[in-house]
Amino acid sequence: MMPSRSTLEPTPAITGLVNLFATHSLVALGEVHGSQDEADFITALLHHPAFPAAVQIIVVEFGNALYQPVMDRFIAGETIAARDLRPVWRDFFGWGFDAPIYEQFFRTVRAINRTLPLAQRLRVLLGDPPFDWSQITQAVDLNSMMEKRDLHYASLVETHILAPGYHGLLIAGLGHFIREWAAPDAPDVHNTVQRLERNHPGSVHIIFPHIGFGAETSALEPYLAGWPIPSLVSLRSTWLGELDAALHFGNFQPPGVEPPPLKQGFTLGHMADSYLYLGPRSSLTRSTYNPAIYRGDELLHSELQRRHSLVAPPGYVLDLLTEGDPRLFPD
């Protein structure tokens, strides 16, 4: 039996998200890295007049905490040279978040702060652990940092948001915010949300964006047709929340490759609380690297390739000199 359209009641996503802070200290927005549509949604959210009154701190994955003093000065309005600012996102684990949307996020917060009274200005905390790429020469050097990523992020949230009684918007990749591990043989580790809820149960509301339904996308997406863009809908007690979570994980598999085995009965509702609809999968777009940056800076290009070689799966090629596909999912 196909789902009934009447069982879902999407609400305007921006006001819906802001209203969540009336009942939760934290809203965790899972980010699809490079998504232009999600970045545009975040920009519109930041500009909503009710947002600064509801939120005091934003914690982002796409920033190296080594540069937190630089970011604090920049967000406060101080002039920072581009060469000093760009390492914030470029020196992230891996080869950096150098797509334009990440720099634009920080500049948007800075611009909004200029319009706000001092007491209402937003603070941005850089969620990745502080580390210096010049000290990383082999893959094993990254192991200790990898183990600290979720711990560092969660510790920031506990210290700077929960302890003083503030409200915070958390932005990071989906894996950091999954409420339960999906694999039947999941390791005894804890991601960011699991760490937070262990000590602060009920403090986090998790939102995952729509990226399709794997092999069932063409069958299920028509049931979302007509929704306003952007929309937010609860996953609790709805057919959407009861969908097999494998349909979500299947979105990341190469053609012909089956998604990993999951726990029996594991659903979208086990992973998150709400679902953010930004349009059908085929309409979603990507913020792409600018090849001209790397063609004109051989040292930067070589360094990013070096970092990539230390963290990427075998056979994965980083091509920074060719303009990328503007579609988020080219399939």
Regions of interest found by a model, annotated:
Residues 1-331:
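Compositional signal for N-terminal targeting/processing segments
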